Amino acid sequence: MSWGLGRLMQHGGDLTEVELTLAGKTKTVTALYDTGNTLKDPMTGGTVMVADWTILRDCCPGLYLKQSDMASPEGLLGRLHIAYPELKPRLLPYKTISNAGGMLLALRPEKILIQGREERMLIAFSPVTVSDGGGYQALLGGKR
């Protein structure tokens, strides 16, 4: 994956509304189509949406998630397996423009609707906000 927060400040991409269902809770977020987001599911080759960690916090209140928890996704993985086994959480390797890489917590939501169409993809949760000014909460790879 190659997405960098500094590069996002120069975005001119399209925004879209995404409705996702996680742990039985439905949330609508704004996503940016980001051609620089090349993160793929290593098992299927499918697209991965990168989202703010706060989406996971809001949909899974039983985790009592804090931003500092996202710095160690390995530890959070076990907590998620116990509290929300149906989400089938996993770790996803990534690399950014400004970072050598690491692991992101990822899971497959029950449902994702993009422009009214149901999609199947993983959501990986960023330990920092993906938007430079709060205009969106997620990144979708490719173009609309």
Residue ranges and their predicted role:
Residues 43-47, 62-65, 134-141:
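Surface-exposed beta-strand edges and their flanking turn/coil or helix-capping segments
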Residues 50-76:
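Long, charge-rich C-terminal accessory regions
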Residues 1-42, 47-50, 57, 69:
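Canonical alpha-helical transmembrane segment with a positive-inside/aromatic-interface signature
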Residues 42, 52-53, 59, 97-100, ...:
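Surface-exposed loop/turn and secondary-structure junction residues enriched for glycine/proline
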